[in-house]
């Protein structure tokens, strides 16, 4: 019984130390990947996978892709696309603190 409790406690500690991720990894969009007034929802799904979140902002449909990796340091990237009534990109924003993005986007 005591051994089982010790084993359970070790498993809890090891699980707490594991890296936590939220969302799916997706590539940073190149500057010409998303073209306002041209890029469709289907193209975005092909490029980045299904969005993590969907919503409405000031009457426009929005899709958001989020990837969070807990560790030291904590890393986050987010892509948000706003759509026209026709379902094409109206505007988008991308932010990240991943080292590779920090180097290429600065």
Q: Where do the PLM segments sit?
A:
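C-terminal motif of bacterial Sec signal peptides marking the signal peptidase cleavage site
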Residues: 13-16
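Bacterial N-terminal signal peptides that target proteins for export
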Residues: 1-7
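Residues within mature, well-folded domains
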Residues: 18-106
């Amino acid at each position: 019984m005591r051994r089982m409790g010790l084993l359970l406690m070790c498993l809890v500690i090891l699980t707490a130390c594991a890296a936590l991720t939220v969302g799916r990894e997706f590539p940073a969009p190149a500057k010409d990947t998303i073209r306002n007034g041209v890029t469709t929802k289907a193209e975005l799904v092909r490029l980045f996978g299904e969005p993590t979140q969907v919503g409405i902002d000031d009457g426009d449909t929005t899709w958001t892709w989020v990837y969070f990796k807990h560790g030291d340091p904590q890393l986050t990237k987010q892509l948000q696309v706003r759509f026209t009534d026709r379902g094409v990109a109206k505007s988008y924003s991308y932010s990240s603190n991943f080292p590779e993005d920090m180097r290429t986007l600065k």
